[in-house]
């Protein structure tokens, strides 16, 4: 699957593996992911895989666009499988000793347990070998030093995240990383320390916090053998202590300098991401980075539509790669079709993935048309299990009601979306439904627009009417067309002949 530069949208209905997609990237390249997550358990592996039989989980990551970039070359140069292409592979497979025992027939397939497996990360290898053709006992590429991954920054923002806690804790706070990246001059640091020392002396000298009573009580309990002098004050200040003590304070029309804990969850998420953006920008400007990526899961989880859109536009403007998962119809209309990666359930065990913009049947003008047409309503077709395209609002309201009343079919419960295109330009939409773009079923329903001759043979001038669309030519393995006008014509002729 080709992931474009800039901002990529992983699109799909629930339970299509969008979160797994991000986790797969992290398994390969995120040095901050704890090793315990890399040691898979049976629940992490597809239910059709029997780990008692020798098998593997393999995730391949290919990296391009690093040639001529010093820091990137230093990181991925040894991972190249050919000039300009580096390959990184996460594998969870039987341990080397187990593979050797199986080869020597000292152990039998069908007897393996979870403890017989381990994870490894390798790089390079033969570029002509397709990752799908690598078997569990094939040795491909060479091991990497795990510490090398630390120079490539991966930030993962889950959908249900406690950003308030992260902003408060020094270890997880992006604010601390941002201040560190600002490289404050030592002279400026010393000025801040002098100001803090002066304040400490005033605090320690205040009569109200003298420690005489505590000192006297301590002497009574310990006796002279363990006596120590006690005073109250602040420890010797350090610049790191200043950074740890810094807190974000917010001000709006109603309140002044309040803590983020008094703020809404959605705006705190935007605040957190804003600090990250600034940190990434500083990191890139210093040219010390070997790369960075933000993995953002469902930004719509905490944000209303306007904030979703502003956050997405901010991501698009950033000079680094970002990948977000979404099922928001407020985000998808504003994303370029080239940024779509669509995950679709087709009924088979595997989820189908596709990049519609790579479909050779779509030319540039048709891609532009689709980007213009796919507004918040029409982009529902990206998330539906099946799709019915209709001309306008009449069909949009009547067809669901008729099907429910006559056939007892609830389209929503069947995962079927009716999409009005407000016209008869079905051809561009129909091209989307294929094994390359959207591998899901689509029905095109056109209404009974009659020519004058269908009602009265004496009417002239119908040659000036536009030709009706040739719907049958749009049909393929995924698209079927239903033209109501055929039935209406037949019935009207029967009426005239009666």
What are these regions (language model features)?
Residues 50-54, 80-83, 146-150, 265, ...:
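Conserved catalytic network of the ASCE P-loop NTPase/AAA+ motor domain
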Residues 344-498:
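Acidic, divalent-metal-binding catalytic cores of TOPRIM
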Residues 1-30, 248-377, 396-397:
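Switch/communication elements of ASCE P-loop NTPase nucleotide-binding domains
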Residues 1-14, 23-69:
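Extreme N-terminal "head/tail" segments of very large remodeling/mechanoenzyme assemblies
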Residues 30-55, 281-289, 323, 348-350, ...:
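Flexible phosphate/Mg2+-sensing switch loops adjacent to catalytic phosphate-binding sites
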Residues 166-169, 176-271, 275-294, 453-454:
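Extended helical coiled-coil dimerization/tether regions that scaffold
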Residues 35-51, 67-193, 258, 464-491:
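Glycine-rich phosphate-binding loops of NTPases
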Residues 155, 294-296, 388:
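Hydrophobic positions in the central parallel beta-sheet of the AAA+
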């Amino acid at each position: 699957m080709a992931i474009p530069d800039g901002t990529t949208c992983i699109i799909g209905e629930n339970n299509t593996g969008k979160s797994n997609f991000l986790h797969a990237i992290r398994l390969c390249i995120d040095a901050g992911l704890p090793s315990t997550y890399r040691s898979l358990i049976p629940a992490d592996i597809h239910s059709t895989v029997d780990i008692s039989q020798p098998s593997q989980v393999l995730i391949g990551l290919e990296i391009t666009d690093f040639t001529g970039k010093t820091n990137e070359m230093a990181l991925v140069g040894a991972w190249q499988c050919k000039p300009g292409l580096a390959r990184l592979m996460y594998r969870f497979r039987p341990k080397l000793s187990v593979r050797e025992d199986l080869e020597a027939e000292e152990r039998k397939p069908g007897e393996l347990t979870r403890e017989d497996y381990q994870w490894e990360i390798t790089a390079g290898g033969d570029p002509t070998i397709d990752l799908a053709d690598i078997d569990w006992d094939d040795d491909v590429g060479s091991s990497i030093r795990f510490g090398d991954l630390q120079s490539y920054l991966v930030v993962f923002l889950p959908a249900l995240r406690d950003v308030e806690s992260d902003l408060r804790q020094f270890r997880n706070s992006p604010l601390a990383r941002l201040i560190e990246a600002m490289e404050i001059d030592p002279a400026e640091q010393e000025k801040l320390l002098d100001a803090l020392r002066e304040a400490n002396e005033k605090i320690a000298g205040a009569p109200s916090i003298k420690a005489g009573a505590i000192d006297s009580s301590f002497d009574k309990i310990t006796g002279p053998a363990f006596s120590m002098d006690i005073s109250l004050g602040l420890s010797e200040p350090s610049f790191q202590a200043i950074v740890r003590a810094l807190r974000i304070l917010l001000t709006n029309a109603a309140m002044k300098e309040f803590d983020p804990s008094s703020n809404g969850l959605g705006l705190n998420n935007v605040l957190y991401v804003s600090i990250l953006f600034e940190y990434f920008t500083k990191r890139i400007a210093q040219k010390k980075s070997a790369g960075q990526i933000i993995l953002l899961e469902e930004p719509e989880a905490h944000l209303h539509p306007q904030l979703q859109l502003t956050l997405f536009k901010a991501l698009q403007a950033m000079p680094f790669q970002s990948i977000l998962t979404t099922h928001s119809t407020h985000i998808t209309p504003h994303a370029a079709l080239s940024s779509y990666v669509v995950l679709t359930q087709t009924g088979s065990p595997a989820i189908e993935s596709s990049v519609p913009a790579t479909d050779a049947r779509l030319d540039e003008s048709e891609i532009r048309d689709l980007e213009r047409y796919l507004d918040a309503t029409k982009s529902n077709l990206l998330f539906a299990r099946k799709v019915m395209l209709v001309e306008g609002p009449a069909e949009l309201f009547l067809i669901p009601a008729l099907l429910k009343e006559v056939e007892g079919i609830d389209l929503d419960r069947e995962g079927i979306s009716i999409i009005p295109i407000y016209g008869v330009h079905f051809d561009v939409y129909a091209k989307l439904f294929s094994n390359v773009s959207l591998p899901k079923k689509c029905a095109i329903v056109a209404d009974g627009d009659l020519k004058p001759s269908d009602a009265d043979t004496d009417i002239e001038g119908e040659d000036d009417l536009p030709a009706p669309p040739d719907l049958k030519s749009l049909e393929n393995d995924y698209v079927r067309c239903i033209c109501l006008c055929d039935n209406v014509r037949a019935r009207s002729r029967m009426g005239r002949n009666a």
